[in-house]
Amino acid sequence: GLGDVYKRQIESYCTDTETPLVISVVPEEKAPELLLRWPRLRMNNERNWKDYLYRAEDMAAFAGRKYSGQRNHINKFRKEYPTAKFVPLTGADMPLIENFWADYEQEFQKTSFNAKRELAYAKALARLLPEGWLLGGGLLVDDRLVAMSLAENCGGTLIIHVEKALYSHQGAYPTLVQAFAAHFGGDCVYINREDDAGDRGLRTSKLQYLPVRLAGKLRFEVQCEADRLREIPTVTTPRLTLTPLEERDEAAYNALCLDDARNRWWGYDLSLIHI
């Protein structure tokens, strides 16, 4: 099929460019298919990159004792900001969103490279809202945006790419989560709030919403026979002995590399290389 054609093209490219074949963000259910194609794989399934999956109906209702904490935070937010309302966001709301980013950065206290990069990516994604394929929504308090989310509906799963709220407005996050799920998740079975990237605070928060599953995103490194060798082998023939290089071989190796006359026998001329 077409998938096999793509796999062959990828293999050819990696062979021609001497690039290691690495496949990332592979859903767990796709692993058997890759193992059939490449039986020698090194797999990585890091906890930091597992996606948090929730039932859409749970996020939209927060029903039952297990969600009493979220409901309490929402009630406090509604009491503190009685005029707050959820609104869908479109490309026409870009000025409102830009003002939100300005307010958000005033309260943003994380200094790590990853945190700053994630914020930059979130802002870049928001600029794509006018293209029409993103779902956007936010909380307005007196015509000021205090929280916003960006998502996609992919095959019955609502994937939340961005979820931001002003820290000064306590309870804004659970209020946003519930309102966004209620508005956009009606035809969805699951809501994917993506990974926590190893951030402790984010992990604690996402676990408090009681995910039904942590979905792995596998990383495969395709290997060859040579990758199975634990050490460089010693090969002996009547005329040749091949052994691993040692420190004492440095002078002889350098002399060989700089011997132009001898190197011509191997099909290359180092004198033609200009630095």
What does each model-identified segment do?
Residues G1-Y6, I275:
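Short, small-residue-biased leader/transition segments that mark boundaries at the very start
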Residues T17-V26, G186-E194:
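Conserved GNAT acetyl-CoA-binding A-motif
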Residues P20-R37, N48-K50:
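Short, glycine/charge-rich beta-strand/loop segments that flank catalytic centers
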Residues P39-K110:
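Acyltransferase donor/substrate-recognition loop-hinge adjacent to the catalytic core
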Residues N44-Y52, V212-R228:
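Conserved catalytic-core motifs of GNAT/GCN5-like acyltransferases
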Residues K85-L166:
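A conserved beta-strand-loop-helix scaffold within acyl/acetyltransferase catalytic domains
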Residues G91-E105, E225-I273:
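GNAT-family acyltransferases
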Residues W133-E221:
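Aromatic (often tryptophan-rich) hydrophobic motifs at membrane interfaces
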